[in-house]
């Protein structure tokens, strides 16, 4: 694996993916993360909007807690809860809400500028995905920074011009691509196979999500924190 410490050559997408897979294979966070994340995805669909929505929200918050602990495990090798985690999760929720607001503000005029139809929808989806990936990649280090209780702000992350930002964008594209292709190929399938494909997509999302957390957190711990 390529050395990702400060002063070493900027890692490639392959390096990051290998690093994330290496973490995910032995992560103590793997099972609790999978249970919480899958619960957040499937419970609303199985139990309905009321009970399922409440339990899905609880699982979503639990996912953020486990993601925080997973990021810390990827950096330190230790998996466990810290007293600083609740405040860190609240900050993370706030950032997620902020990202959602930004995406909503951007998507409305973008949708108005693009013609309708299948081609228009495809172009809109790709542009919106590009905006989301670019934004998330710029603040990717927020999760591991909060996990380690390091001082960091969105402004400081957006101001950074480190050589691996492009690599982070490509990492998120690579980990999102399987589900994008799955939706494109089987999005209109209904019935049992539709449910099966949705479950497969959820499992893929969880697995690649853990890989991404491991890759970004290790990059942050080995390079960004010592830069």
Annotate each PLM feature.
Residues 30-34, 57, 93-94, 122-123, ...:
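Hydrophobic alpha-helical transmembrane segments
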Residues 16-27, 77-101, 155-159:
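Interfacial transmembrane-helix boundary/kink motif in multi-pass membrane proteins
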Residues 83-127:
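Hydrophobic, well-structured mid-protein blocks that either form specific transmembrane helices
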Residues 1-45, 49, 129-194:
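Nonpolar helix-loop interface/hinge motif
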Residues 48-63, 120-133, 201, 205:
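Alpha-helical transmembrane segments
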Residues 46-57, 112-120, 189-195:
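Membrane-helix interface and helix-disruption motif detector
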Residues 2-3, 26-79, 95-107, 176-179:
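Short, small/hydrophobic-residue-rich motifs at membrane-helix boundaries and re-entrant hairpins
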Residues 2-4, 58-80, 138-149, 167-227:
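Juxtamembrane transition segments at transmembrane-helix termini in multipass membrane proteins
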């Amino acid at each position: 694996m390529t050395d990702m410490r400060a002063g070493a050559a900027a890692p490639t997408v392959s390096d990051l993916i290998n690093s994330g897979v290496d973490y995910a294979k032995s992560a103590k966070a793997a099972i609790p993360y999978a249970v919480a994340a899958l619960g957040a995805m499937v419970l609303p669909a199985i139990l309905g909007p009321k009970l399922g929505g409440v339990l899905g929200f609880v699982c979503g918050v639990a996912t953020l807690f486990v993601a925080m602990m997973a990021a810390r495990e990827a950096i330190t090798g230790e998996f466990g809860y810290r007293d600083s985690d609740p405040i860190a999760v609240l900050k993370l929720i706030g950032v997620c809400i902020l990202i959602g607001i930004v995406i909503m503000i951007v998507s409305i005029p973008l949708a108005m500028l693009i013609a309708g139809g299948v081609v228009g929808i495809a172009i809109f989806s790709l542009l919106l995905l590009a905006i989301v990936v670019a934004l998330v990649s710029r603040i990717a280090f927020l999760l591991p920074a909060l996990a380690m209780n390091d001082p960091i702000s969105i402004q400081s992350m957006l101001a950074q011009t480190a050589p691996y930002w492009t690599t982070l964008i490509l990492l998120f594209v690579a980990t999102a691509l399987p589900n994008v292709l799955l939706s494109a190929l089987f999005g209109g399938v209904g019935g049992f196979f539709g449910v099966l494909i949705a479950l497969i997509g959820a499992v893929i999302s969880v697995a690649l999500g853990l890989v991404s957390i491991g890759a970004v957190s290790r990059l942050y711990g080995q390079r960004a924190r010592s830069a």
